């Protein structure tokens, strides 16, 4: 069973007198910074000049260049997109990592795949709330919290785990529960979930369903509602009470269709494909491809992204959403939000 820590298990005193630098002020960055500050922690923000700098300053933080913030801080939490972290780390953070400092992440990708190799003289931990930044902040303000993960990659001082837990407590996660994990487990399961289920699997399933109906002569508008729009209704039920509550809430006809058709859509071959995807993640094949894609300035990523925007599902969806002002597009930073 997983080891879970709550507020009463954690001594936040290990952070007393220390300065925490939040590097990045996006989806997760603004939430971490404000939550820790409201918990009584000394917090500064490290950024490059731009809108985020102005926003952090407006929110009352002392804002510095990344290198200056890293120099001033005892604990440095990097909350930048994965693809930007290695360069920023190498040029602006690593030179300021004196012995005994702490380097922190909310996603283990760059450490696990050796894109960031910290010196042996610093602590390295992961503190990852399992929710988007706006929810991390809102639940904290409401007196609750989003569950989180915590892991130690390197313990140079003997206090890395205590510091990681204290950070998670101050961010509100220990109000709900903090699960101990490893950088490897967090990274590999996070990538697998995104690729096989949450993003890759779901978007491919929705498109295939839409295309099947349209190719059979049904109106694209009706196909959109049945295959994409109503997905939220089902996912919300699953989110609230698992598959059991979803099945309790739908009609018996829908539930019987679930039992009969589901195994025909997701077959043994589908599960084998999932295992192959997991293998690509575990061996580093996926990471290598993504790193090379970024080094080449993302030609394939950009081409696929543009093609997908013009899929008939997207075209009809944009038209239908104009009929539904109650449907508002949310900002990026939900799945993989720790990267922002």
Swiss-Prot record:
Its cofactor is Mg(2+). Residues 2-181 form the KARI N-terminal Rossmann domain. Residues 182-327 form the KARI C-terminal knotted domain. Binds 2 magnesium ions per subunit. The keyword Protein biosynthesis does not apply. Disulfide bonds: none annotated. Substrate binds at residue 251. GO terms for biological process: isoleucine biosynthetic process; L-valine biosynthetic process. Its EC number is 1.1.1.86. Pfam families: KARI_C (PF01450), KARI_N (PF07991). One of its GO terms (molecular function) is magnesium ion binding. InterPro entries: 6-PGluconate_DH-like_C_sf, KARI, KARI_C, KARI_N, KARI_prok, NAD(P)-bd_dom_sf. GO terms for cellular component: cytosol. Transmembrane segments: none annotated. Involved in the biosynthesis of branched-chain amino acids (BCAA). Catalyzes an alkyl-migration followed by a ketol-acid reduction of (S)-2-acetolactate (S2AL) to yield (R)-2,3-dihydroxy-isovalerate. In the isomerase reaction, S2AL is rearranged via a Mg-dependent methyl migration to produce 3-hydroxy-3-methyl-2-ketobutyrate (HMKB). In the reductase reaction, this 2-ketoacid undergoes a metal-dependent reduction by NADPH to yield (R)-2,3-dihydroxy-isovalerate. Belongs to the ketol-acid reductoisomerase family. HAMAP family: IlvC (MF_00435). This is Ketol-acid reductoisomerase (NADP(+)). It comes from Halalkalibacterium halodurans (strain ATCC BAA-125 / DSM 18197 / FERM 7344 / JCM 9153 / C-125). The lineage of its organism: Bacteria, Bacillati, Bacillota, Bacilli, Bacillales.
């Amino acid at each position: 069973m997983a080891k879970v820590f709550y507020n009463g298990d954690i001594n936040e005193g290990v952070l007393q007198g220390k300065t925490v630098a939040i590097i990045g002020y996006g989806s997760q960055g603004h939430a971490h910074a404000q939550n820790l500050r409201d918990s009584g922690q000394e917090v500064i923000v490290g950024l490059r000049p731009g809108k985020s700098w102005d926003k952090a300053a407006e929110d009352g933080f002392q804002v510095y260049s990344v290198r200056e913030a890293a120099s001033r801080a005892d604990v440095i939490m990097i909350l930048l997109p994965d693809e930007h972290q290695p360069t920023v780390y190498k040029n602006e953070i690593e030179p300021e990592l004196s012995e005994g400092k702490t380097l922190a992440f909310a996603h283990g990708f760059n450490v696990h795949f050796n894109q960031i190799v910290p010196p042996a003289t610093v602590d390295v931990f992961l503190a990852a709330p399992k929710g988007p930044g706006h929810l991390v902040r809102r639940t904290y303000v409401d007196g609750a919290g989003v569950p989180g993960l915590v892991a130690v990659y390197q313990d140079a001082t003997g206090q890395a785990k205590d510091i990681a837990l204290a950070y998670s407590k101050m961010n509100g996660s220990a109000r709900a529960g903090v699960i101990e994990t490893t950088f490897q487990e967090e990274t590999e399961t996070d990538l697998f979930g995104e690729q096989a289920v949450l993003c890759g699997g779901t978007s491919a399933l929705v498109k295939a369903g839409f295309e099947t109906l349209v190719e059979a002569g049904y109106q694209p508008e009706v196909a959109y509602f049945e295959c994409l729009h109503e997905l939220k209704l089902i996912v919300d039920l699953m989110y609230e009470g698992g598959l059991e509550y979803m099945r309790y809430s739908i009609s018996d006809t829908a539930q019987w269709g679930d039992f009969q058709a589901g195994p025909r859509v997701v077959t043994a071959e589908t599960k084998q494909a999932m295992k192959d995807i997991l293998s690509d993640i575990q061996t580093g094949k996926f990471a290598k491809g993504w790193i090379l894609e970024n080094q080449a300035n993302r030609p394939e990523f950009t081409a696929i992204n543009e093609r997908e925007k013009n899929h008939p599902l997207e075209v009809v969806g944009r038209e239908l959403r104009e009929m539904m002002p109650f449907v508002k597009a949310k900002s990026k930073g939900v799945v993989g939000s720790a990267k922002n």
